C-alpha cells in the first residue's frame, strides 16, 4: 500500500489515494526533516501569494455634492475658502471643492495673488499610469463628454477606453487602419471625429458606431475642430491645406490656402467667426471662415508651430501657441500681437492646453517629457480695462525687453519621452498626458501637507524598477518623511488622538481632557496666518 522512494524509514512515502500529499513519518528520527520540509513548502506558497495592492480612485462626486449643497444654501462666496478652511493637514483633503468653486466667478480678489485660489487646482500629483499590453505611441487623448472615461488613440489605429475614476482598462477596438493623429468631440457632445495618417476622417456616435468615412486630405490629418453650432468642421493636414466641411453631408465647402508647408494645428473660436492655424512654415494665421480669406498673420516664431488654441472661457480673447523654438506665445486677438512669451530653456514645446475652468491657467508640455503650468492673472488686464500699450517700464504686463514669464509650477520628469497630448478633465480636477513613451498618465491636485511630494519620481527622476507603481502609493497618498526632525511641541499623547470620538480636527486649541491644549502636527492654529497668504503646494513657487 505504501511505496518507499528511499531507504529512510518511509520518509517521502506517499499513499496512492492521498493526491500526492506527504504523510507524516512514523519514525521519530525523521520528524525534524519532515517539519523542515513542511516549513519550506509553506514559505514557498506564502512567497507566491500576491501582495495586497491599493488602487487610487478619484471621486469628484463628494466635493461636487458638498458644493451644490452650499450653493443651494447661498454659501457660494468662497473667496476666503483656502485660508479659512483648507489647512496644511492631510485629513483636509476631502474639503477640497470642485475647480469651479475656486474660479474667478466666485473669487472676489482674483487680481490679488495672495488670494489667487487657482493655485489649488494645479495638477502636481502623479496618480496613475495606464498602458496597453501591446504598447504603441499615443498621439492624442480625449475625455468623454460626461468625464467618466478617457479615450486614447494610438499609433496602431486603436481606440482604448480607460475609466476616469479608477483608471482601469475597459475596452479596446480597432478604429483605423493607420495611425490616429487627432480626435475631436462636437460642442454638443453628440459626435466624435477622428483623423488618421492616410487622410481619412471617420464619424463616430457616442457608442463608437462608425457611420461615415470621408477622404479629407491626401496626407495625414493633423487636427480637427467644430464650428460653434456643430454644423461645420475643419480639418488641416500635411498637404498644407485647411478645409471646411459640411457636417451633415460630408461635403467640402471651402479650402483655406496660404501656408507653404504642413499645417500642424488648427482651431475654431468658440464664439467668433474666426479660425486659427499653425504651420511648419513658422507662421500663425487667422482666417475668416465665410470668405476663406486670411485676416492676419502672426509672426515671431522661429520654428515649427506645433499647437495653437483659443482661450475657451473667460474673455475668450486670447490665443496660445507653442513652437519648436522653445517658446509659447500668448496673443491678444484685439491687437493681433503677442502679450506674453513663455520660454523653456531646455527643450522644444509640443503641446499647450487651457484649463477648462480657470481662464488664466495654461499648461505646456515639451519633448523632454516635462510639464509646466502658468498663471496669467497678474499679467493680463481685466475685460473692462483697455488694451495695454507696450512699455519698457511696465513690468506687471511683462512687456519689457525680455517679455517673458516663469512657470508657477513644473514637473521635470513627467514622461520619459516626448509628450504628444495634454487634456484636462471637463471638471478641471484631473489632467491626462500621453506621448512617445507609450503611456497615458493621470495627474491630480496636490494633497494638503504631503512632505514626500518632492520625492516622487516625477520630481527626482528616480526610476528604479517599476518606479511608477511605487510613487507615494499608500492608501491616503500622503507619507511622513522618515528623515524629518520631529518637533516635541507637535507630538500628541497616545490617549489624545485628534481623529477619535469628537472628530478629526479636534486637536486645534483643545485636548481630549478639556484642560491642556495640544496641536496636530503640521496644522496651523486658527489665529496663525501664513506669512505671504499662500500654502505649500508641491512644485509651486511662492507669491
From Swiss-Prot:
Primary location recorded for the protein, binned into one broad class: nucleus
Q: Which cysteines are joined by disulfide bonds?
A: none
Q: Which InterPro entries match?
A: Pfs2-like, WD40/YVTN_repeat-like_dom_sf, WD40_repeat_dom_sf, WD40_rpt
Biological process (GO) annotations held by this record are:
chromosome segregation; co-transcriptional mRNA 3'-end processing, cleavage and polyadenylation pathway
Q: Name one GO cellular component term.
A: mRNA cleavage and polyadenylation specificity factor complex
Stored Pfam families:
WD40
Q: Where is this region: Disordered?
A: 1-31, 486-543
Q: Where is the composition biased (Low complexity)?
A: 1-12
User: Which parts are the WD repeats?
Assistant: 133-172, 175-215, 216-255, 258-297, 300-341, 344-384, 414-453
Its localization reads: Nucleus
Q: Which domain of life is it from?
A: Eukaryota
UniProt keywords, alphabetically: Chromosome partition, mRNA processing, Nucleus, Repeat, WD repeat
Job description of the protein = Required for 3'-end cleavage and polyadenylation of pre-mRNAs. Also involved in chromosome segregation where it has a role in chromosome attachment to the mitotic spindle.
Q: What is this protein called?
A: Polyadenylation factor subunit 2
Name its species.
Candida albicans (strain SC5314 / ATCC MYA-2876)
Q: Which gene encodes it?
A: PFS2
Amino acid at each position: 500500500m505504501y511505496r518507499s522512494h528511499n531507504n529512510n524509514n518511509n520518509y517521502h512515502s506517499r499513499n496512492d489515494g492521498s493526491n500526492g500529499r506527504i504523510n507524516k513519518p512514523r519514525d521519530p528520527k525523521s520528524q525534524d526533516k519532515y517539519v523542515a520540509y513542511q516549513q519550506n513548502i509553506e514559505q514557498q506558497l506564502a512567497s507566491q501569494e500576491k501582495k495586497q495592492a491599493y488602487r487610487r480612485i478619484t471621486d469628484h462626486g463628494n466635493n461636487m455634492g458638498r458644493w451644490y449643497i452650499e450653493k443651494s444654501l447661498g454659501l457660494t462666496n468662497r473667496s476666503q475658502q483656502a485660508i479659512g478652511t483648507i489647512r496644511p493637514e492631510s485629513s483636509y483633503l476631502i474639503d477640497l471643492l470642485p475647480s469651479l468653486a475656486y474660479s474667478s466667478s466666485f473669487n472676489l480678489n482674483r487680481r490679488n495673488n495672495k488670494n489667487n485660489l487657482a493655485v489649488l487646482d494645479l495638477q502636481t500629483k502623479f496618480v496613475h499610469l495606464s498602458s496597453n499590453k501591446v504598447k504603441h505611441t499615443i498621439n492624442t487623448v480625449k475625455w468623454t463628454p460626461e468625464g467618466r472615461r478617457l479615450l486614447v488613440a494610438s499609433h496602431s489605429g486603436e481606440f482604448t477606453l480607460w475609466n476616469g475614476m479608477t483608471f482601469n482598462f475597459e475596452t479596446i477596438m480597432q478604429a483605423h487602419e493607420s495611425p490616429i493623429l487627432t480626435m475631436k468631440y462636437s460642442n454638443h457632445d453628440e459626435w466624435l471625429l477622428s483623423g488618421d495618417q492616410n487622410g481619412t476622417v471617420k464619424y463616430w456616435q457616442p457608442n463608437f458606431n462608425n457611420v461615415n468615412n470621408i477622404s479629407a486630405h491626401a496626407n495625414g490629418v493633423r487636427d480637427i475642430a467644430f464650428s460653434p453650432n456643430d454644423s461645420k468642421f475643419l480639418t488641416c493636414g500635411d498637404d498644407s491645406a485647411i478645409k471646411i466641411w459640411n457636417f451633415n453631408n460630408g461635403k467640402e465647402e471651402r479650402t483655406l490656402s496660404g501656408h507653404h508647408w504642413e499645417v500642424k494645428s488648427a482651431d475654431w473660436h468658440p464664439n467668433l467667426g474666426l479660425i486659427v492655424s499653425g504651420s511648419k512654415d513658422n507662421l500663425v494665421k487667422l482666417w475668416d471662415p465665410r470668405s476663406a480669406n486670411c485676416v492676419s498673420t502672426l509672426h515671431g516664431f522661429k520654428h515649427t508651430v506645433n499647437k495653437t488654441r483659443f482661450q475657451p472661457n473667460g474673455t475668450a480673447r486670447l490665443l496660445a501657441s507653442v513652437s519648436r523654438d522653445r517658446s509659447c506665445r500668448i496673443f491678444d486677438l484685439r491687437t493681433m500681437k503677442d502679450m506674453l512669451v513663455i520660454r523653456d530653456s531646455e527643450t522644444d514645446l509640443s503641446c499647450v492646453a487651457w484649463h477648462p475652468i480657470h481662464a488664466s491657467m495654461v499648461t505646456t508640455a515639451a519633448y523632454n517629457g516635462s510639464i509646466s503650468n502658468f498663471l496669467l492673472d497678474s499679467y493680463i488686464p481685466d475685460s473692462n480695462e483697455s488694451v495695454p500699450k507696450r512699455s519698457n517700464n511696465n513690468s506687471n504686463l511683462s512687456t519689457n525687453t525680455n517679455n517673458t514669464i516663469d512657470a508657477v509650477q513644473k514637473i521635470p520628469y513627467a514622461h520619459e519621452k516626448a509628450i504628444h497630448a495634454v487634456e484636462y478633465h471637463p471638471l478641471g480636477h484631473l489632467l491626462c498626458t500621453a506621448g512617445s513613451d507609450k503611456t497615458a498618465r493621470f495627474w491630480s491636485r496636490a494633497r494638503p501637507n504631503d512632505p514626500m511630494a518632492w520625492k516622487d519620481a516625477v520630481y527626482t527622476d528616480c526610476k528604479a524598477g517599476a518606479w511608477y507603481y511605487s510613487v507615494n502609493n499608500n492608501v491616503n497618498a500622503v507619507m511622513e518623511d522618515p528623515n524629518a526632525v520631529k518637533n516635541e511641541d507637535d507630538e500628541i499623547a497616545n490617549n489624545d488622538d485628534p481623529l477619535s470620538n469628537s472628530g478629526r480636527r479636534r486637536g486645534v486649541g483643545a485636548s481630549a481632557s478639556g484642560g491642556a491644549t495640544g496641536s496636530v502636527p503640521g496644522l496651523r492654529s486658527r489665529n496663525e496666518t501664513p506669512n505671504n497668504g499662500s500654502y505649500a503646494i508641491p512644485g509651486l513657487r511662492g507669491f
